[in-house]
Amino acid sequence: MFYANMKEFELIKLVERLFGDEDVITPAGKHDAAYVKIGNRLIVLTCDTVNEKSDFPPYMLPEEMGWMAIAVTLSDVAACGARPLYFLSSISLKSIEFFEDILLGIKRCADRFGVKVVGGDIDFSEITTIAGFAIGEARRHITRRGAKVGEGVFITDLPGKAQLCLEMLERGAKREELPYAEKLYTPVPRIEEGMRIARYASAMTDVSDSLAVSLHQISQSSNVKIVLDNIVLSHLSPAENALELFLYGGGDFELVYTAKSSDDGIRIGRVERGKGVFAEIDGKTFEVEFRGYSHF
């Protein structure tokens, strides 16, 4: 993971221009996943890719690679408040030595959330790469668009933990020294929380690219201003860059959402008239940049 300019999001905008007018409820690029109507069922479709060069941290076991591949894909389903049903994967390896371990990781995560693994593909590659495709079913249509003035901004858990652990590894820390190793190696998609939140939230997305990126996406899609007025950094202590981690760190698979009230998350801000994302700390207000994790 690394902080970078928003080239990846520029590529997504290209996808929107080419495919964003398809005759579906929520087309490509508009949300974490696509919504399509099949009969009377509201179906959610999404895919994600992870590889050893840009996604797998040091000391990651093959079984954890499999877990991560399905977990990050299911996180997009969670951001729709949907129940995941089926999963397929395309696995590219330079050696079949750890193939079974990767499958076991996929199975562990799938079994935890009642997901059926129904197929996939195997290929050769110089770097281990796993692409996942998930199908889910939602009860209602919720996206990044819909936040309303006067609502609160909530998150299922405080962000920055995965990035903190990654930066500790990059400075020479051992895996057993990490305070939140599970956030980095076996992230848990917020499936149950997402289904509950979707019943009442006005907008929702996951924060895998960073809290800042996700809030900007909600702000732009909903045409509102978001102000963070309850920034908690104690969980990132004693990191000197705790605020940077909180706002711009990637790799957390929490859900951020807007609602009048909520018992499913931590309130971190409010929705106002206007545009952009801002933060209030010690009586001072500053603008939050559109910045976070990018593959490019």
From Swiss-Prot:
The keyword Metal-binding applies. Belongs to the thiamine-monophosphate kinase family. Mg(2+) 2 binds at D48, D76. Substrate binds at D55, Y293. Mg(2+) 3 binds at D32, D76, D206. Mg(2+) 4 binds at D32, T46, D76. This is Thiamine-monophosphate kinase. Gene3D superfamilies: PurM-like C-terminal domain, PurM-like, N-terminal domain. It is an enzyme of class 2 (transferase). Pathway: Cofactor biosynthesis; thiamine diphosphate biosynthesis; thiamine diphosphate from thiamine phosphate: step 1/1. Mg(2+) 5 binds at D209. GO terms for biological process: thiamine biosynthetic process; thiamine diphosphate biosynthetic process. ATP binds at G120, D121, R144, S208. Catalyzes the ATP-dependent phosphorylation of thiamine-monophosphate (TMP) to form thiamine-pyrophosphate (TPP), the active form of vitamin B1. InterPro entries: PurM-like_C_sf (IPR036676), PurM-like_N (IPR016188), PurM-like_N_sf (IPR036921), ThiL-like (IPR006283). Pfam families: AIRS.
